[in-house]
Amino acid sequence: MSAQDSIPYLQIRVDGICQVTPTHYTKTIQFRDINYQLSDNEDKQAIFDGWCDFLNYFDSSIKFQFSFVNLTALRESFVRAIPSRSDQFESIQRELSKIIEEQQAKGNNGIVKTKYLTFGIDADNIRSAKPRLERIETDILNNFKRLGVSAEVLNGQERLRVLHDILRMDTPEPFTFRWEDLPRSGLSTKDYIAPSSFLFNRAKDFRMGKKFASVSFLQILAPELSDRILKDFLDIESNIVVNIHVQSVDQVSAIKTIKRTITDLDKSKIEEQKKAVRAGYDMDISATRS
């Protein structure tokens, strides 16, 4: 299997729709920060309530994930974003370049933090998927606007750039993809974003080009979580991608799941009581402790 084959999508279109499987299609929206940590408690509660309403928009037919991407940007990429000037603004351009160098010298590491929401639906074909994805996209953008969050939809080239920057961290090569190059080159979109190789021969990490990486899975089962848990992850001064996968569950399925969980807990409790009796403990005491 090639490195390209290890990237799990079928095609990405110019309009930003990605066909992940024969029947699953996605789009991605980039969004900005809300200044949550510096807000007072009343504002924090209002922000929290707003996000709850935002999440409640998604029904069980829409799968979505939040992606928080922290990547070290090369100094050259910053400088490219500041075009050279030979006019009255030349001194400003030099000053900006100097600031970049000073920040990196101070150990800022040039970490660039971006945030995305990717949503997907199941459909028989692109013709039926496209209009529904566009309706969901409009709703999400309106919901972000109500939260006071700026957001924009990524087109196909922009989605490929995000993947390129993650998968090719080991190379300073710029992202040079252009749609018009595909027909005459005989290449696919994956050829522009895939690393030189993937190597999955170790238990706790893998190799992606010349970089070593590791993936951890966190299943959230706690009834309460600190509102700082995500911030603490993203404050790590290193290349890190945090994905939060969310799947809404319809009410009937949720009730069935709760009942099944209660039944499993009751069974476990009975088994523990039986073990206690066999060990010579009083079953009533064991039940009380449970």
Spell out what each predicted region is:
Residues 1-290:
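Extended, folded cores of ATP/NTP-driven motor/assembly subunits in large transport
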